[in-house]
């Protein structure tokens, strides 16, 4: 049996609590509040405010998960509250008996009978004292619990206010920092300097075009942006500073509230820290027990002297018992007084917290206007800040335009190279490789039919035929011009390098060069990745290049040895590709055999040939270097010059890297000019760095020598392996020669790197010379600085002399001002005394007239608000009608509600699923205009507040400020009264009173036509709405029948789709076609007999079948299965070589899926 859990409810004003067992039996927050209303005796549930621990508002859906709820009365949070409400919480319904001293031992009799009777009476008094003290103890403990509960309630409401304030303050601070950042980095004052510097930039040449960076900017637009920012940015900053001051004041007031609560808590600790209730009650119980024990001992033992017991009780026990009881009673009174004080002072705390929240609510509303789009007419709004940001961005182009233009050049070149490789390297190679695969299949089928076709003709009269698909891979779409500012200019890599040098030599920021170099390196990396993809695609055809005899040999060898020689496969594929390329070359040379004479086409391909990339430089006749990896021999190489072209591209990349390194060194040299104070130290560090580099060079030479020895040893091993390989497989000797040439090429690269290193050393030497020249420049600048300091001292002495003269003149003027001000004060005092004598009577009459005028104005304003609220309710009725497809119309003088189609399509913009409101400012009904006309009298009252003149003071302060009234103010009061009477007569007492006309129209009781005659629904709007609901209910029944029919059709379609094969977006339950596939493994595996099966897909690669039983797929060419589970895997650097985690030898970063499927039989 489990223990019950309870929800504890605390009254925040009295500290009392009650418990409710969980789960809570109330079904809604309203029911729960009505229960609390009966407990707290509150007149309305709207006055209840509920909080949970840590200042969180009550979420009724989680009420069974809570332990505590604090209940507050909203009536005590206002600036003015009803004292009766507070007295309701401070009233105490219990009283305690004040202890009285014992009178039983006051007698001085010595008779044993009288002494015995007195002792028994004293024992009864002690028992009564103990009983009263026990009751007082319980009440005191209850008061302690109540005080602690009130303190917890104060902490809870303070945490609630703190959370509310901090949330708004956090949002405000983020926007304030944003505005401060704009103000700090604003360029509206200094943009002209940057613009002039940009104008000094020389033209940059790209091909035959010259580009002036300043031409991209519009001077008039820049001037307009600067003017707009200068006129509006200070207003925005001032607005946010004002809001920041308000938030700071709220923070200070919040600290004051916190200190007030802390002071109350410390006061309670200091007042009651010396009283220990448990020890006090222990003393009382002990004394009472001693009195009782003595009497029992006297009655049981005659040897005890009665007079001594009497004396002990009279002088010790009874006085001590009385003193402790009085101390307990005083402790109780102190607790009750402190609780009453705490309850009253907590009201001021609640009021302060409410005021803080109101201030933060105003901050929140102002912040919402400034940070979200709205229709506010305030000159400082969200649109203003956005416009300032846009103009600041445009002004920043004066500084960032060189960097932006460089990014545009690099991106245009990167897109060009990507498109060039994709269209000419990838697409064309895919087409060629697919054609090669089809040719291999044609050859295999031809051989197979040659061997077994005759036997098939014996079984059937039909001649066996075969057909294969044709492949046509074409590039659809044209290149899109992304950057219009460059027009049709073709950007080369050399142009980018020249532009980086152009920026470095200009007055642009030094970070621009670093960023441009980084983006340029990213361009090279992107192009190299496309090259790798092209090489991979170029080797696809080799996987199907083995003949039938070779396949049978490899399969038999696999049975014997358990593995396949992938090198042999690659070499065979290479030979087949060379033969095919020689055949194509022969066809190309002699394709025009009908024309005479026949000539070889030795002319280099033109720039329009779509088989070559435009970014590859002219080819050089060099020997093709061998590949260290046999797989790379599958790269498309029709002639030797193709490899030399790739080699030249690599050399170009190396030259570019060296040039970028030189640019970086120049940048470091230019930075040395600004490092005046640390120049010598930088020079020493540079020398030390050169020494370290020399040591590193020596170490690299040693490492290079060791690597070269290892390479020579590996080369000897490879030569031996190739010799054995050549003997076994009769490989062409050209492969060995290519490997030897590659080694020679590596030696040439090493020598070239040594030359580059010597070139860098020469550059360091020139840098040392430049440092010496800079030192001389710094010494001359220091001399000029000393001359400037002497000139500054002379100017300061002249300024100090002028300040002494001005101070003397200022002192004389100040003395004259003091004399004149004293005379003015005397005259002012005489004038005020005179006015007090003559204005006392007139002031009282003026104040009476002013009070009456204020009453009239308040009544008219209240009637105006009442009429506006009635009109808003009428608009709400119109919104409700139109959301239901009904429209309020007027036919002649009769009002009707008619059914209109098309109104429900006008849905709200904020919530497209909400069909209850229409997203327009005003409903479509024309009757609203007539009702609005009848409210024209409201505009007359709208200016009543402006009629009032400035009142010197209220009636309570009339005697203090009576000297400020005069005859002119009296005339103003009278004229004001006449105007109010005129307005009242015009609206309410004229022949055709406007107010009566408005009431007659807005009531809709005359000249109305009901939708249907009904004795129950005779109201105009209720009648139309009830009829509309009945129509909708009938439509819903018909719609339900149609939905059932549609559901039956959907079930039929789902049954049909269950037998369709899925090709992408595989999910559990899909029917999938699995085909055996071949995985190119980078490493040899022990068990190659396992056949991988891949799902037939379109755009969803790497879905492999989980084969638990090899007999399941044995001797099958395909399998159809229903997916039972899909396990996602990813190849990482850690599991790339693990066959259990990467059984299909996929590349690092590839996500593949292991599919468990149940075979379906049809």
UniProtKB/Swiss-Prot annotation:
Comp. bias (Basic and acidic residues): 961-971
Ranges that cross the membrane: none
Superkingdom classification of source: Eukaryota
Keyword set, alphabetical order: Autophagy, Coiled coil, Membrane, Protein transport, Transport, Vacuole
Predominant location category: membrane
Pfam families referenced in this protein's UniProt entry, alphabetically: ATG11, ATG17_like
One GO cellular component term noted in the UniProt record for this chain: phagophore assembly site membrane
Membrane topology note: Peripheral membrane protein
One record GO biological process: autophagy of mitochondrion
Coiled coil: 563-591, 659-760, 798-870
Compartment(s) of residence: Preautophagosomal structure membrane; Vacuole membrane
Residue span of region Disordered: 620-648, 949-971
Residue stretches of biased makeup (Polar residues): 634-648
Protein role: Involved in cytoplasm to vacuole transport (Cvt), pexophagy, mitophagy and nucleophagy. Recruits mitochondria for their selective degradation via autophagy (mitophagy) during starvation. Works as scaffold proteins that recruit ATG proteins to the pre-autophagosome (PAS), the site of vesicle/autophagosome formation. Required for the Cvt vesicles completion.
Assembly notes: Homodimer.
Family: Belongs to the ATG11 family.
Identification of the protein by name: Autophagy-related protein 11
Gene name of this polypeptide: ATG11
């Amino acid at each position: 049996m489990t223990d019950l859990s309870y929800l504890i409810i605390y009254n925040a004003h009295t500290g009392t609590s009650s418990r409710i067992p969980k789960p809570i039996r109330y079904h809604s927050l309203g029911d729960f509040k009505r229960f609390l209303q009966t407990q707290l005796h509150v007149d309305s549930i709207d006055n209840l405010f509920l909080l949970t621990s840590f200042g969180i508002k009550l979420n009724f859906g989680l009420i069974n998960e809570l332990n505590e709820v604090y209940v507050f009365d909203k009536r005590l949070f206002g600036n003015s509250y009803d004292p009766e409400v507070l007295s309701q919480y401070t009233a105490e319904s219990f009283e305690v008996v004040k202890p009285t001293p014992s009178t039983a031992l006051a007698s001085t009799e010595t008779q044993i009978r009288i002494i015995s009777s007195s002792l028994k009476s004293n024992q009864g008094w002690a028992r009564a004292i103990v009983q009263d003290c026990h009751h007082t103890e319980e009440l005191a403990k209850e008061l302690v619990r109540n005080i602690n509960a009130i303190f917890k309630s104060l902490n809870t409401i303070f945490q609630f206010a703190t959370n509310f304030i901090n949330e708004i303050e956090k949002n405000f601070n983020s926007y304030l920092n944003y505005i401060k950042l704009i103000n700090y980095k604003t360029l509206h004052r200094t943009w002209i300097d940057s613009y002039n510097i940009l104008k000094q930039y020389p033209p940059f040449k790209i091909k035959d075009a010259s580009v002036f960076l300043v031409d991209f900017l519009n001077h008039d637009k820049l001037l307009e942006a600067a003017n707009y920012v200068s006129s509006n940015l200070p207003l925005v900053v001032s607005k946010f500073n004002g809001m920041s001051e308000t938030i700071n004041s709220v923070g200070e007031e919040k600290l004051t509230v916190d200190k007030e609560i802390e002071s109350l808590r410390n006061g309670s600790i200091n007042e009651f820290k010396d009283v220990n209730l448990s020890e006090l009650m222990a003393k009382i119980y002990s004394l009472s027990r001693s009195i009782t024990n003595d009497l029992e001992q006297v009655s049981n033992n005659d040897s005890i002297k009665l007079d001594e017991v009497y004396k002990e009780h009279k002088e010790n026990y009874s006085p001590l018992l009385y003193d402790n009881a009085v101390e307990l009673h005083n402790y109780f009174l102190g607790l009750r007084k402190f609780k009453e004080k705490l309850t009253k002072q907590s009201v001021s705390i609640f009021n302060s917290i409410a005021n803080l929240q109101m201030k933060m609510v105003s901050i929140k509303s102002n912040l919402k206007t400034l940070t979200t789009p709205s229709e506010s007419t305030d000159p400082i709004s969200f649109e203003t800040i956005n416009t300032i940001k846009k103009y600041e961005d445009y002004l920043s182009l004066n500084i960032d335009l060189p960097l932006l233009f460089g990014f545009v050049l690099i991106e245009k070149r990167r897109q060009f190279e990507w498109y060039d490789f994709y269209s000419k390297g990838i697409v064309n190679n895919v087409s060629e490789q697919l054609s090669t695969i089809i040719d291999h299949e044609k050859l295999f089928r031809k051989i197979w039919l040659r061997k077994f076709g005759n036997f098939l003709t014996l079984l059937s009269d039909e001649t066996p035929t075969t057909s294969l698909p044709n492949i046509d891979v074409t590039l659809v779409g044209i290149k899109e011009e992304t950057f219009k500012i460059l027009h049709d200019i073709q950007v080369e890599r050399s142009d980018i390098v020249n532009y980086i040098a152009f920026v470095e030599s200009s007055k642009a920021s030094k970070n621009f060069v670093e960023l441009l170099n980084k983006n340029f390196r990213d361009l090279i990396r992107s192009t190299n990745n496309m090259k790798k993809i092209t090489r991979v695609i170029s080797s696809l055809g080799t996987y199907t290049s083995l003949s039938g005899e070779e396949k049978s040999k490899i399969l038999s060898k696999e049975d014997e040895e358990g593995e396949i020689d992938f090198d042999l496969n690659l070499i065979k594929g290479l030979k087949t590709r060379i033969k095919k390329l020689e055949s194509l070359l022969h066809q190309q040379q002699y394709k025009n055999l009908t024309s005479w004479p026949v000539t070889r086409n030795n002319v280099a391909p033109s720039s329009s040939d779509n088989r070559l990339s435009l970014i590859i430089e002219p080819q050089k006749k060099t020997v093709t270097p061998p590949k260290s990896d046999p797989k790379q021999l599958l790269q498309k190489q029709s002639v030797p010059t193709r490899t030399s072209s790739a080699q030249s591209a690599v050399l170009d990349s190396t030259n570019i890297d060296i040039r970028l390194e030189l640019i970086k060194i120049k940048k470091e040299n230019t930075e040395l000019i600004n490092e005046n104070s640390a120049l010598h130290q930088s020079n020493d560090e540079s020398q030390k760095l050169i020494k370290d580099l020399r040591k590193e060079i020596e170490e690299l030479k040693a490492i290079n020598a060791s690597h070269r020895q290892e390479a020579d040893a590996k080369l000897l091993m490879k030569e031996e392996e190739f010799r054995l390989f050549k003997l076994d497989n009769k490989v062409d000797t050209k492969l060995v020669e290519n490997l030897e040439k590659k080694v020679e090429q590596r030696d040439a690269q090493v020598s070239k790197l040594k030359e580059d290193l010597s070139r860098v050393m020469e550059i360091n030497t020139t840098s040392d010379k430049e440092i010496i020249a800079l030192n001389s420049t710094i010494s001359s600048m220091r001399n000029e600085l000393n001359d400037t300091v002497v000139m500054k001292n002379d100017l300061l002495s002249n300024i100090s002399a002028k300040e002494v003269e001005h101070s003397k003149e200022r002192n004389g003027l100040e003395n004259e001002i003091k004399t004149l001000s004293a005379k003015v004060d005397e005259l002012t005092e005489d004038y005020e005394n005179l006015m007090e004598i003559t204005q006392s009577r007139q002031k009282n009459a003026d104040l009476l007239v002013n009070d009456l005028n204020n009453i009239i104005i308040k009544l008219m304003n209240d009637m105006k608000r009442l009429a506006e609220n009635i009109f808003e309710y009428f608009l709400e009725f119109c919104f409700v009608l139109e959301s239901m497809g009904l429209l309020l119309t007027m036919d002649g003088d009769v009002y009707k509600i008619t059914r209109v189609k098309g109104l429900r399509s006008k849905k709200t913009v904020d919530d497209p699923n909400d069909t209850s409101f229409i997203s327009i400012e005003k409903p479509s009904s024309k009757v609203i205009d007539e009702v609005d006309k009848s409210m024209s009298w409201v505009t007359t009252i709208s200016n009543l507040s402006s009629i009032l003149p400035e009142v010197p003071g209220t009636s309570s302060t009339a005697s203090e400020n009576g000297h400020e009234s005069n005859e002119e103010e009296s005339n103003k009061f009278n004229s004001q009264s006449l105007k109010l009477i005129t307005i009242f007569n015009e609206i309410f007492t004229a022949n055709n009173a406007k107010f009566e006309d408005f009431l007659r129209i807005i009531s809709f009781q005359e000249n109305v036509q009901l939708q249907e005659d009904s004795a129950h629904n005779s109201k105009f709007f209720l009648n139309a709405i009830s009829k509309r609901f009945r129509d909708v209910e009938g439509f819903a029944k018909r719609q339900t029948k149609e939905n059932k029919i549609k559901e039956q059709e959907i079930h039929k379609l789902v049954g049909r789709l269950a037998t369709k094969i899925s090709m992408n977006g595989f999910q559990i339950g899909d029917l999938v076609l699995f085909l055996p596939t071949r995985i190119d493994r980078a490493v040899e595996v022990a068990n190659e007999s396992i056949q991988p099966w891949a799902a037939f897909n379109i755009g969803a690669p790497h879905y492999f079948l989980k084969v638990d039983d090899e007999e399941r797929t044995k001797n099958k060419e395909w399998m159809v299965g229903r997916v039972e589970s899909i396990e996602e895997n990813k190849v990482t650097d850690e599991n790339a070589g693990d066959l259990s985690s990467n059984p299909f030898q996929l590349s690092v970063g590839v996500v593949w899926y292991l599919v468990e499927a149940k075979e379906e039989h049809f």
